[in-house]
A protein has these predicted regions:
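Nucleotide-activated chemistry modules centered on ATP-dependent adenylation/adenylyltransferase
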Residues: 1-39, 47-217
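Single conserved hydrophobic/aromatic residue that forms the stacking wall/gate
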Residues: 214-226
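Aromatic pocket-lining residues of Rossmann-like dinucleotide-binding sites
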Residues: 44
Length: 226
């Protein structure tokens, strides 16, 4: 069995190489939300000239999309390390998400539906990066403990082959990246959503919350009966 790749270590090795060669490559960074972007931007801005791409047609409803978009803009405007960071905001077209996941609607969170969503958003990043001559592209998604870093990197590498722009390997949750994102979210008073983004994850989250309420209330009901 092949050894599991350490994407965080691969990224650190690349950064060391760029530092030694006194290079600061351009990077198109797909961002899913402000909390996930915070620690990633803090880690990368010293080593890359970053443009953030906000393309997330999966987010539901539109008010949620607008809230996450506004928080990302605020974060970029307030973090000291992001003074040179640009933001590209692609149109919000939810139909693109529903087309990408058609037939996968009933698959549980974390499965093939999510992988199709990863690809949709990362492909938009790869296309934009190729069209605007970036040195690399990647996504903030791997900072979440709920996101499959191996799958994200596999998708990124396949898209790199297809579009001719290198994918920057990453597993941003490693080396306490996720923990740092929580701290930065508190420091900047960021809105931290309680579901991934799509209508399916929202419904799944609400169903789990409902079951939790039932379990909590059951002892109370039994006490009343006795």
């Amino acid at each position: 069995m092949a050894n599991k790749r350490n994407y965080a270590k691969e990224l650190n090795t690349l950064i060391e190489t760029f530092t030694h060669e006194e290079k600061r490559p351009t990077l198109l960074l797909h961002a899913c939300c402000a909390p996930c972007s915070s620690a990633v931007l803090e880690k990368l801005t010293a080593h890359f000239k970053i443009t953030v791409l906000f393309y997330n047609p999966n987010i539901y409803p539109e008010a949620e999309y607008q809230k996450r978009e506004a928080e990302l803009k605020r974060l970029i405007s307030e973090m000291p390390c992001t003074k040179e960071v640009a933001l590209v905001d692609l149109p919000y077209v939810p139909e693109e998400f529903f087309t990408a996941v058609r037939g996968l609607e009933h698959i549980p969170e974390g499965g093939e539906r999510c992988f199709a969503c990863y690809k949709l958003r990362m492909e938009a990043a790869a296309k934009y990066a190729a069209g605007h001559h970036f040195d690399f592209f990647t996504t903030t998604l791997s900072i979440s403990p709920l996101k499959n870093a191996q799958k994200l990197n596999e998708i990124g590498e396949a898209l790199a082959e297809e579009y001719g722009v290198p994918h920057l390997p990453s597993d941003f949750k490693k080396q306490e990246g996720y923990k740092r994102s929580i701290q930065l979210s508190a420091d900047y008073n960021l809105y931290r959503q309680d579901f991934c983004g799509c209508v399916f994850s929202k419904k799944e989250r609400e169903a789990k919350a409902h079951l939790s309420l039932i379990h909590i209330s059951e002892p109370t009901r039994l006490q009343l009966i006795s």
